[in-house]
Amino acid sequence: MRIWKTLVCTLIAAMLAGTALAELTEMNHYVVKADVRAYMTDEDLEFYKKAIDAILAREKEVRLSDDYDANLRVLGALSNNPIYFVVEKEEFNSKHTKLRFKYAYSESEQAEKIAYMDEEMLKMINGAIQPGMNELEQALAMYQAVVARIDYDYEWLDALNTSDDKFLFPQIEIYQALSTGKGVCHSYTFLYEYALQQLGVECLRYIGNTTGDPDDGHMWPVVRIGGEYYQCDPTWDDQGETASLQYFGMSDSERLESGVEGFEFSLDSAYGEVKCDSEDLKPLHQAMAFALSGDHSAILYDSFGTEIGEFDTETHGFSAK
């Protein structure tokens, strides 16, 4: 444990040394799940923004378009927005032109919770991102930041597994993970996705069965880096105080090899099928810890904190130590 604590402090210092942080001053509440945005029109997006503004202002209803299908697309986008946890229930009016909201909290509680979530997200992002980072470096930096921010909530999982009615079990969302410092696989995925959305990096979600038990579900992100899609699993890479890269940047075949016999997964995406074909990040998988050096390279370490090599984050070349 002492080795890991020393190494983590070294990694953080290396990632921050000599460079001012690129400050985000506010969260973009208008972000849309990437694949959902793909089937929304520009007009849908404007109504979506209008609805977000209405929720933030605690309006009881918002007037949408006269097109019911378009309004369903807007609702689909809303349901994937991290601030939507403040809405307990929504319903359309009889003409399906207005969306009415019932809020889960008082006005002051809602404002406090959203402000807290924004503050914690900004702190996490600004504490990890440096000016000039490319997409891979941003993805790596936020991977480390998410793993450092929350721990896996085994008590929650045990309670879920023993619950008589899982549909009534409290919903997982970002605020819950940030406020408790704990979460499950969905929490890691949602946090990672939301952070990357703020940085303009495309992130989707995979759902699947990773243990051979069809009732034992799992969720993890897929990230688009340099035009290629890669599967990542921050839940499995959580080493307690830092992230390993054993499951970062996997191809579909590498992901299949990481599970057990009968392992299946599918993309929780309106895109349909997304291929993760590239294996050029495979050298990263040997790292039990890493540090971004600031010159477009990642220093990889083994479980004892010994440097094992350097990975070029631009060319994806690896030089063993």
Model features per residue range: what roles?
Residues 2-22:
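Sec-dependent N-terminal signal peptides of Gram-positive bacterial secreted proteins and lipoproteins
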